[in-house]
Amino acid sequence: MYLQVTRGSRDRSYLYDDQYEPTVFAFTQKEKFAADAPPQPVALATTPDIRWARRDIKTTNLLGQVMAKQAAHLAGAYEALMIAPDGDVTEAGSSSFFFIKDRELWVRPVSNDILHGITRQTMLRVAEQHQLKIREETYTLDQVLAADEAFITAASIYVLPVGRIDDTEIGDGGVGPVTASLRSAYLELARAEFPKVPETA
């Protein structure tokens, strides 16, 4: 289910007060559960991160993400990997980005620079259970391109391995063993919490 709540509707104005009646909108969308076998690795394309500064607030103002994902699509990639003006990687267009180097899991720390995704939180819990060292630090694109493995997560895609970023293969370009293990554990946890989802994709 996808839920959206707005302050309400009034005559066009940039000002607001406490007299609005909130508008609540929700819809459901049927999704097939992920198959056990890891999917083929996807490609990412780097794009400038042009979003506003409060990315931790989940809003419907997604123009920056739409433009990034469209640019990635036109470049033949599955998803965008957004780069801040200082050269650091922030996150993917509509997913959280992780990479593995020397069996350490890297992910950008929680701040106003990224969306605090629920799937991201769950993946960190799974990684802790696997006794992986977690590095919640900022990092550059050069660090990412030298990674052993990489993957993206979101509620709609679960865990997808990343095999290439721009023209650079990540690791050997295949599904890394740590990624496969984390994905399997994540799906097991999801099935335990949602046991009545029989279909696979």
Where are these regions (language model features)?
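ATP-grasp fold ATP-binding core
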Residues: 1-5
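Helix-start/capping segments and mature chain N-termini
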Residues: 6, 11-201
